[in-house]
């Protein structure tokens, strides 16, 4: 039990001693009465740019909390129940083979870690390379355009998030989120991810964190195999029996399917095997780049160079009444770069990435428009995937091949003309670019909605619609185009023992929610099955 205090505001120049004094004053106690103080959340309140505050939420541990709280009447002070992940009792159903985890992104990593902690010794199969070899492969692709179809920005140890920003924000309310953060810190992530309101690890640090968790899984008896691709599943009478990995048939009764949102060949295999799935909504658009200083000044005003203020971010939304579509920023990367993120030959994809320091010149974000199954041709549950492929192919051709991206300045995009020269903002896309009209690789309604959104967002961030801001095509992998349907026990509704998990299954979005989903799936497996013999 702890006392939670919210909305403790400090100035930018205050140190943590001021925080402690304010806590003692609120609770009418001395600092000697406090046995422990945990910072739960730290955020920047920049609503008044001439008086920016650092806002804290804390948990205070002391003697006689209830007695103390009974005499304090403050809406920002309450009891906080400290909930730990409860120990799970193993089930009784016999399992002949060790559980298998396919995919080693956030969902697969935390499913495997949870299973390993409980003695289930999972076997992991990841189609891509380990994170060190994968990094070499990806950097080579960015340099010479040679795409490895099995190991790239989408596939390999760490998942797609390993080449993003390592963002740890989430909207889900689940006590497992705290466990995920604790495990990341144990594995080498900075301690502040536990309380920063917009926490991130950064691509550079995340790689080491992932390797350390892999070694922990192995220490606990798990097995992690790279360059190992799931090719087929076999089930009988609605019950999973085996899988094929790299041509080898493997007995399997419990399969955590954590394939990520870009494993299109796996989706196709599952569709052929009649695994229940549906098309789902997602969003497509472009990457937009501005000078990071412009965003900093807009968000922080004259304080934008203060040492306690990091590179500013933004989150923008707009609803087009005319088009009945949402336009929004997504995966905003302060001080980052736009990266080539393809995973199929002849199809172009862009994404954003930041290192931990977020200290590069440009701010970039996806600028995307919602699309739904009604926009996709046909009736197949894979029709959203084919929709993505169509526009990615157009973008590839528009860029001239070799994974160069089509680029257009915002001013030219708004006026439907090809750009001919750059302004202050230099495109950061890692595989080169060509000036092209982006309307040639996007649906007309997406182009129109983007134009509306840019005008609206310029009212919120002055300079958002500046003539020389950069648009890079195209962003299509905002979320999975498919949902793999599952029941209350988190199994496929028509294949017992198959556990669709994380972002690729359509049940998560981002590192934390995917990791939590992986833990929940592992818990269901543990509760169902006895330890493998």
Swiss-Prot record:
GO molecular function terms listed in the Swiss-Prot or TrEMBL record: oxidoreductase activity
Highest taxon, organism lineage: Bacteria
Pfam families according to UniProt: FAD-depend_C, Pyr_redox_2
Gene3D superfamilies referenced in this protein's UniProt entry, alphabetically: 3.30.70.2700, FAD/NAD(P)-binding domain
InterPro entries, alphabetized: FAD-binding_protein, FAD-depend_C, FAD/NAD-bd_sf, FAD/NAD-binding_dom
Protein name: Uncharacterized protein Cbei_0202
């Amino acid at each position: 039990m702890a006392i939670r205090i919210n909305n403790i505001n400090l100035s930018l120049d205050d140190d943590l001693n001021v925080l402690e004094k304010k806590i003692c004053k609120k609770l009418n106690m001395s600092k000697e009465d406090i046995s422990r103080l945990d910072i739960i959340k730290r955020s920047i309140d920049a609503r008044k740019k001439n008086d920016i505050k650092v806002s804290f939420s804390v948990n205070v541990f002391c003697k006689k909390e209830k007695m103390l709280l009974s005499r304090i009447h403050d809406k920002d002070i309450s009891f906080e129940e400290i909930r730990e992940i409860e120990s799970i009792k193993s089930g009784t159903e016999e399992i002949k083979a060790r559980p298998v985890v396919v995919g080693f992104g956030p969902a697969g990593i935390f499913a495997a870690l949870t299973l390993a902690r409980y003695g289930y010794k999972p076997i992991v199969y990841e189609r891509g390379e380990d994170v060190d070899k994968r990094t070499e492969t990806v950097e080579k692709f960015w340099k010479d355009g040679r795409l490895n179809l099995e190991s790239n920005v989408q596939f390999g140890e760490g998942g797609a998030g390993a080449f993003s920003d390592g963002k740890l924000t989430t909207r889900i309310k689940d006590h497992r989120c705290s466990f995920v953060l604790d495990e990341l810190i144990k594995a080498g992530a900075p301690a502040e991810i536990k309380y920063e309101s917009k926490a991130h690890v950064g691509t550079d640090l995340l790689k080491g964190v992932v390797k350390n968790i892999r070694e922990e899984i192995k220490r606990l008896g798990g097995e992690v195999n790279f360059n190992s691709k799931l090719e087929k599943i076999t089930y009988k009478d609605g019950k999973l029996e085996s899988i094929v990995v790299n041509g080898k048939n493997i007995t399997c009764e419990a399969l955590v399917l954590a394939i990520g949102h870009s494993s299109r060949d796996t989706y196709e295999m599952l569709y052929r095997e009649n695994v229940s799935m549906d098309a789902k909504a997602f969003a497509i658009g472009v990457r937009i780049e501005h000078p990071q200083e412009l965003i900093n000044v807009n968000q922080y005003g004259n304080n934008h160079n203060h040492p306690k203020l990091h590179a500013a971010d933004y989150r923008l939304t707009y609803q087009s009444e005319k088009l009945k579509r949402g336009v929004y920023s997504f995966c905003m990367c302060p001080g980052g770069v736009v990266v080539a993120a393809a995973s199929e030959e002849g199809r172009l994809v862009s994404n954003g990435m930041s290192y931990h320091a977020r200290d590069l010149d440009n701010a970039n974000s996806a600028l995307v428009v919602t699309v739904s199954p009604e926009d996709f041709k046909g009736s197949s549950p894979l029709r959203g995937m084919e929709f993505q492929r169509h526009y990615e192919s157009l973008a590839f051709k528009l860029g001239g091949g070799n994974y160069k991206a089509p680029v257009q300045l915002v001013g030219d995009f708004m006026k439907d003309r090809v750009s001919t020269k750059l302004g202050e903002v230099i495109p950061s896309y890692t595989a080169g670019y060509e000036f092209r009209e982006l309307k040639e690789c996007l649906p007309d309604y997406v182009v129109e909605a983007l134009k509306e959104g840019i005008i609206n967002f310029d009212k919120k961030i002055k300079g958002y619609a500046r003539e020389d801001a950069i648009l890079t095509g195209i962003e299509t992998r905002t979320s999975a185009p498919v949902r793999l349907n599952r029941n209350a026990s988190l199994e496929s509704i028509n294949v017992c023992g198959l556990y669709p998990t994380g972002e690729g299954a359509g049940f998560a979005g981002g590192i934390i929610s995917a990791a939590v989903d992986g833990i929940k799936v592992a818990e269901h497996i543990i509760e169902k099955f006895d330890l493998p013999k």
